[in-house]
């Protein structure tokens, strides 16, 4: 068997998430169906580095799969790209070692979250940015977001009832920029891993801080108390993008 690593992007609007599901459309299943056709009907299993939720997009998701033969990477990329649905793009494919695993190999992830604060909202962006038409103090949010950097127990920012026991993660970058029109905010988070709904919960909290309904110090309090009830609401999934996954050499 020959193992291939692929970088893909997808529009998450019409998917119930990356992971295969029994009664809903998923990115994993669509790619497996295409690979199975290319493999003359013999089933191929796809593994993903991250499990994006329903409605979440990806600019640089990484997958791997095994084929019973070796083929030129660009020919394989072209075939997989052109025969996959239009809301999936295959950016690159490369041969990797047989023991490479896209999920367990040491890596970092970068996510972006886009907020549209336009009045009125832009209907063309409704599936690709979360609308928040209320007053926001960007400077307050820029101060608060920096308090998320570093190694912390992020229990207070994960979904209640998550089965993951170790909730300590390291965020190497947490930043917020505003585009030149002032309408779109981009939150960026890079780190060694993120908990279930962690980024959406952090963004929901930051928006509440920006709207002066929480103090800047709330971030430190949530990290200290590890209490989800102290954080803001979960931001909608449509603004979230898995931007990039980087593997250590």
UniProtKB/Swiss-Prot annotation:
GO terms for molecular function: RNA binding; tRNA pseudouridine(38-40) synthase activity. Substrate binds at residue 111. The keyword tRNA processing applies. Its EC number is 5.4.99.12. Belongs to the tRNA pseudouridine synthase TruA family. Formation of pseudouridine at positions 38, 39 and 40 in the anticodon stem and loop of transfer RNAs. This is tRNA pseudouridine synthase A. It comes from Streptococcus pneumoniae (strain P1031). The lineage of its organism: Bacteria, Bacillati, Bacillota, Bacilli, Lactobacillales. The gene is truA.
């Amino acid at each position: 068997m020959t193992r291939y690593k692929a970088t893909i992007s997808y529009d998450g609007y019409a998917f119930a998430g990356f992971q295969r599901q029994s009664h809903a459309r998923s990115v994993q299943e669509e790619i497996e169906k295409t690979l199975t056709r290319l493999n003359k009907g013999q089933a191929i299993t796809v593994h993903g580095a991250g499990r994006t939720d329903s409605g979440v997009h990806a600019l640089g998701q990484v997958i791997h799969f095994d084929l019973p033969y070796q083929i030129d990477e660009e020919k394989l990329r072209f075939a997989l790209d052109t025969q996959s649905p239009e809301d999936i793009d295959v950016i690159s494919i490369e041969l990797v070692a047989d023991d490479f695993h896209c999920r367990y190999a040491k890596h970092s992830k970068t996510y972006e979250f886009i907020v549209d604060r336009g009045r009125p909202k832009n209907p063309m962006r409704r599936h690709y940015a979360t609308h928040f038409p209320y007053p926001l103090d960007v400077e307050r949010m820029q101060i608060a977001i920096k308090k998320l950097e570093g190694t912390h127990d992020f229990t207070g920012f994960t979904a209640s009832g998550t089965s993951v026991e170790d909730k300590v993660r390291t965020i190497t970058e947490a930043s917020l920029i505003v585009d030149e029109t002032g309408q779109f905010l981009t939150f960026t988070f890079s780190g060694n891993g993120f908990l279930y709904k962690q980024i959406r919960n952090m963004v929901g909290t930051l928006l509440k801080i920006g709207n002066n309904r929480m103090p800047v110090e709330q971030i430190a309090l949530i990290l200290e108390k590890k209490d989800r009830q102290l954080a803001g609401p979960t931001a909608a999934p449509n603004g979230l993008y898995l931007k990039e996954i980087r593997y250590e050499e």
